[in-house]
């Protein structure tokens, strides 16, 4: 009797399995099975940096302007005090060995090549195509061969190399990188500072 009961149970289970299989395969053939959408993790959070052509690109489309430096290595030094608290640091410093390539963070026109011996040293000012932004690179060891004012540069293009010219400490070569929001008619030395850190690192500013 037990064998018969077990056999009946087995037949019922097998039948259910066949019905389930036929139903599922039929749904797939008819295209009625809903495929779940990929889960979105933190949809309102910042987009992480990506690698484009070997260059780290932040969520705002800006390249990290020092070759070989990853976004997670950046430190937010914007608004830190300098010179004993007499001035504010309106940029971020990206530490790197002397001679490391400095790359254009964004496309634009080289607006000014300037040597400020007591300030930024060997510097480059690049104006965005819409002229709303200025990208400032300072303390360079020197310029890339052939770089000239009025030249159009692309994102990731070599501008110069990391150094410590100007008022930088020779023991800590770095790129001083600033972004300024420009109003119509403003010149290369003007503009309103914007913190580059969250634009490059994909993180909120630390201050």
Which residues does each predicted region cover?
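Active-site loop architecture of trypsin-fold serine endopeptidases
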Residues: 123, 162-175, 182-186
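Surface-exposed, glycine-biased beta-strand/turn segments
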Residues: 23-122, 155, 164, 193-207
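Beta-rich strand-turn-strand
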Residues: 144-171
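Hydrophobic membrane-insertion alpha-helices, especially the h-region
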Residues: 6-24
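A generic structural motif
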Residues: 95, 127-129, 180-182
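N-terminal Lys/Arg-rich, disordered targeting/topogenic segments
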Residues: 1-4
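Zn2+-dependent peptidoglycan hydrolase active-site motif and core
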Residues: 105-149, 172-174
